[in-house]
Amino acid sequence: WARITPEMLNVSASVAMAELMLSGCTTASDHLYLFPNGCRLDDTIDAAREIGLRFHATRGAMSLGESRGGLPPDALTESEDDILRDASRVIEAYHDPARFSMVRVGVAPCSPFSVTEHLMREAALLARSYGVGLHTHLAESVNDVAFSREKYNRTPAEYAEALGWTGPDVWHA
């Protein structure tokens, strides 16, 4: 990940989107949560616009690195202020709530194991203030369930509900 550039991100997104369109897909979503070397969600949104694919981009994030009890390496994390500020910027720049719009943006902390409880709550408040969707990965393995029970004394579903991460504007992977 340390060598990925904005151009590489744009080209790889363009190729993937072209393959999707060739198979008949007209709408896709992507959960981008790594931003090395100046990469931004804009790089994938630009690819979707160039290709002509309807795109639901989600501004992912990881703020809780290994040194603080999270799963991702510290080098892949961002400050929570930067995450929330960039999520607002991307929503304001690109989100189109109109029916049949070509670009929508959601807020998507990577998982409860890679961000703080504070960021999960703030991300939900931010998304709802803009009327955009919320996305995260939740209970993908028995290890995820064990982590949630050990760290939060709750199942992943109970934890998500306690943080306001349930409802018609939320989708979990």
Stretches with model-predicted labels:
Residues 39-173:
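Metal-coordinating catalytic core of metallo-dependent amide/deamination hydrolases
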